[in-house]
Amino acid sequence: PIKGAPYTRSVLDTYRNNVTACLILSTSKEKGSFDVAATDKFLYALAPLPFATGLFPLALGEEINIEFLPAVKDAVNMSFSERNKLGFKMAMKKDLGFFFGLGSVAYAVSLSLSSMTSGGGGIKLSELMKCKAHMILRLLQAKHRCKKENRPLLPKDLFHLKGFMVAGTDNLCYKDDLEALWGIRPMELFAGTEPSIMGTETWTRKGMYFFPDTAFYEFITEKDMMKNHEDPSYIPPTY
């Protein structure tokens, strides 16, 4: 069975505004410091529609014309592995500014990128010659540095992300590893199929803030929650 949720135009408008805010916040290191441009490139590591994450590039496209690698219309017809390989090859040619995915998926993609650059299945010379000059130089410098430090090539050696976002319930398990791989700490988002995007971290990367216009929130105390677990017939007061 597929879990679905009706999204009205007003819900989509709110969602668009909030994901755009997340994009901007993901680049910030302090209040008032942001860095987003329409020429930025975004690695596509999201499940396509009908999954909720498939809305992200479509909604963002209504606000800013950021290029996804690979293009959304092509990515939706590819397997996970095919998207990774093509996205990486395109990123080497065009550079990369943003990355967003579920925590575990982002980790898998990151390891995949590392294996593609470190293993025998890396970029061929013919493909390398299609890359921008600064990317070729960056790759050569990265390989020299990694050989000197006796370590594998990591995504952070090739790409200097402006923003990195993760969502999902398992982010705590991967955020430190993802930071080590990319050299930037991912900003966590909280979202679901029914309410869409509900909260985000900010430049501190410590704690999340609710989007007040996404849903009508109700809260119960931890004490009442535990009481409800013990006695399902108990109806806790909400705030």
Task: Annotate each PLM feature.
Residues P1-N17:
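Conserved AMP-binding A3 loop
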Residues K3-Y7, S33-F34, M187, Y209:
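Short, surface-exposed helix-loop/turn micro-motifs enriched in polar/charged residues
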Residues P1, T27-K31, M92-D95:
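Short, solvent-exposed loop/edge-beta patches enriched in aromatic
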